[in-house]
Amino acid sequence: SLRFERSSSDYLSKTFGSGGNRKTATQSFWLKRSLLSTNMMLGLTNYPSGSYYGIQALTDDVLDIYLYYNGSAWEGRLKTNRVFRDVSSWYHFVLAWDTTQSTASDRLKFYVNGVQETSFSVETYPDQNQDLDWNNNIAHQINSGGGGAFSGYLAEMVFIDGQQLDPTSF
């Protein structure tokens, strides 16, 4: 696992040489928080147009997941009602999307410890066949950005291009 400290400026960054499937993918990772009630950014990309994506824990300890913000409108955002305050446990998160799906709620799915999260205070889905910035040939970063540095542990981050998978695949 990797350990990140809020007081450090350490981060990971990867820019892909070419974009992959920008409509369908899955990201799975294990996370253990060590600092609560702080704004924390796990992933962020700033694109020249001002768009970005990320997974962010807010000061009220809910998660805010956004796939694409084009500078004026969200193209996929889920903000949990559930809080994540257990600093002694690892959480397994799976974020899976497929914008080719005809049903909006099938285009973006979020799982916590093997169970699909279905209660959100904000719930918007990408348009059908929307290209997203995840898996584009731009900087993909962990622990970077304006939302605040992450304090905790991150393990087994897996990105699957071209498939919308559920937690049983990991």
Which sequence ranges carry the predicted segments?
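Extended recognition patches within non-cytosolic domains
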Residues: 1, 7-8, 102-104, 109, ...
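Short surface loop/edge beta-strand patches of beta-sandwich-type extracellular domains
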Residues: 5-24, 75-85, 144-146
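Surface-exposed loop/edge segments in extracytoplasmic proteins
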Residues: 50-53, 72-78, 115-121
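Short, aromatic/His-centered strand-loop micro-motif at the edge of beta-sheets
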Residues: 66-92
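Extracellular glycan-interaction patches encoded by glycine-rich segments
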Residues: 68, 131-154
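Solvent-exposed, conformationally flexible loop/turn segments
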Residues: 86-88, 124-129
